[in-house]
Amino acid sequence: MTQDELKKAVGWAALKYVRLGTIVGVGTGSTAAHFIDALASVRHQIDGAVSSSEASSAKLQSLGIPLFDLNEVDSLDIYVDGADEINGSMQMIKGGGAALTREKIIAAVARKFICIADSSKLVDVLGTFPLPVEVIPMARAWVARELVRLGGAPVYRQGVVTDNGNIILDVHNLAIMDAVALEEQINNIPGVVTVGLFARRGADVALIGSEQGVKIIG
């Protein structure tokens, strides 16, 4: 199976976690896009969706899935999204698609976080994938210096502006042994909006696609 076929398999496998008559939290990226395709097959049986990015919102609307603003919703039953890396403790690096802040907010609201990923994203130690940090533009140089002090090598993601109007620094050369502590350290740097470490609020269930099928963790 190709990587895209593995992503499609886990996207459709996540459909069994969707309860009819609920509003579903939807993530961003190529794997989440397959879940949106699957969600369209039950669009008349759910109330709608809350999206973590403008791109996912556009896809949801194009498929006729009602879209809600998060401020209109008291709670979400589930949030389904991909990951750039996930470890055995269900901690993740996310933000390759630059939607990390909205993803983290929706994950916090949802009762259950379903991570969908192909097997290449499952790692023992987080950090091979550069860690995205969303930063207020005026603080870019300051935050970069602070990230160097933490042992990282930050690189400005040229030409990318988040849906919130901010920039992304991708931090290389990190072997993340204590993800919870590092998440807190980086989030405490003035000028950081949020870091793409999902450790304090990790996934509850991971659906991992491989040649052998979809493996359920959690």
Curated annotation (Swiss-Prot):
Active site (UniProt): E103
Name of the protein: Ribose-5-phosphate isomerase A
EC number: 5.3.1.6
Subunit note: Homodimer.
Keyword line: Isomerase
Any one GO molecular-function label of the UniProt entry: ribose-5-phosphate isomerase activity
Record: residues binding substrate: T28, G29, S30, T31, D81, G82, A83, D84, K94, G95, G96, G97, K121
Phylogenetic lineage: Bacteria, Pseudomonadati, Pseudomonadota, Gammaproteobacteria, Enterobacterales
Pfam families reported for this sequence: Rib_5-P_isom_A
InterPro entries: NagB/RpiA_transferase-like (IPR037171), Ribose5P_isomerase_typA_subgr (IPR020672), Ribose5P_isomerase_type_A (IPR004788)
Source organism, top-level taxon: Bacteria
Family to which this protein belongs: Belongs to the ribose 5-phosphate isomerase family.
Enzyme class: isomerase
